[in-house]
Amino acid sequence: MTGKSPEVIPHTPVVQDLRAAREIFWINPHYRATKEFKEAQFGISLSDIHDAEERLRRFAPYLAKAFPETQPAQGLIESPIVPIKRMQSYLESRYGVQIPGDIWLKCDHQLPISGSIKARGGIYEVLKHAEETLIKQGLLTREDDYARLKDSSFRDVLSHYKIAVGSTGNLGLSIGVMGAELGFKVTVHMSADAKGWKKALLRSKGVEVIEYTSDYSKAVEEGRRQAEGDSRCHFIDDENSRDLFLGYAVAGLRLKEQLEKLNRKVDADHPLFVYLPCGVGGGPGGVTFGLKQVFQEHVHCFFAEPTHSPCMVLGLATGLHDGIAVQDIGLDNKTEADGLAVGRASRFVGKIMAGLLSGAFTVEDAELFRLLQALDHAEGIQCEPSALAGMAGPARLLLCKEGLQYIREHRLEEGLKRGTHLIWATGGSLVPVEVMKDYLSRGK
């Protein structure tokens, strides 16, 4: 992460709209509907994703013992996909557009252990670090039954090691809960945007929470700096972590299985459109990478960001990646979507997404609350504000000339009628009842 402001900021129409905090829909001019992925291009391959999936399966017996809520899925951390027909009708009415195809919800707000998409990457990296530490000490082999890790002797060993992370909330929750359960001493550096209940939950698990009055980037920077001087401290770097990225990418393999079980095809005649909330980029970037590996040119991924924190679309649209922050164009990086309150995108993720991401759009906070309330009313599903960022995606795609041009260019007009729109809901099941009541009241 450079942390530097650019000397010259491009004055393109999209940057001007972002500067004015207007809602935009941006199509990536560098998107390539490629069938092939060269490992040298990304430094990450499909075999790396399979390796991550195998590691999660090795840990499944342990997770089933440590977290009973994972037992229905035999210790796998996974969420269902559900059709949301009533919400689709609401979106068509609200935005005044017919949406061909079916809208489904990917329920990562229900993920066990930490209740958000961050359970995928955050928990994976903690598990990998624990495995490597114990194997190095000769206390574990990959052939062992990992259920034995619940034994207190392993906790005693890992209690001599530390894990640190910078977070706006959900990543810290997933790493804190998992790390503390394994016995690690965990420190979460939290930005000013982090919700009080998330800090309280972490502290109740014995996690050290260090609060900052500044934003996410500062929390990460401080966490990284403090960890550098301690050889026993593993810093989980949300801006640059390959392991976090791979943990998220496993979702691509899992989604393929889920869609097959539901007899929902993904091919040239049945395109898949996926709408993902985006903060620094690791979660949606990893998921997108996994999806593109599995479905190739038949999946079309779009990131959704708050109008006041559009760091990824700003980095991609200017080509500056982490060389520009939203503050450089006069935005305050203040949003109720705490998981998306990031001013400077990950360069690591931005570079990989440069040719894989179909586009991105921004959403006003007030609209997030309206959609949050509507989802509860239509489907009885409750999510936190960040999780609603992608909800308007199918309508927004069809309402702008750029989106319609994208559909024509990729010959999707007919396929769209048989296609699937998947809204990725990123968090919400751990939100306290009183906080959720407040969210719902703000959407009326």
Swiss-Prot record:
GO molecular function: D-serine ammonia-lyase activity; hydro-lyase activity; pyridoxal phosphate binding
Keyword Lyase among UniProt keywords: yes
GO process terms (BP): D-serine catabolic process; isoleucine biosynthetic process
Membrane is among the record's keywords: no
Entry-linked PANTHER family: D-SERINE DEHYDRATASE (PTHR48078:SF9), THREONINE DEHYDRATASE, MITOCHONDRIAL-RELATED (PTHR48078)
A Pfam family annotated for this UniProt entry: PALP
UniProt-recorded name of the protein: Probable D-serine dehydratase
Gene3D superfamilies, alphabetized: 3.40.50.1100
Record PTM N6-(pyridoxal phosphate)lysine, positions in chain: 118
Cofactor: pyridoxal 5'-phosphate
Reactions that this protein is recorded to catalyse: D-serine = pyruvate + NH4(+)
Entry similarity comment: Belongs to the serine/threonine dehydratase family. DsdA subfamily.
Gene: dsdA
Enzyme Commission number(s) of this protein: 4.3.1.18
Keyword vocabulary terms for this entry: Lyase, Pyridoxal phosphate
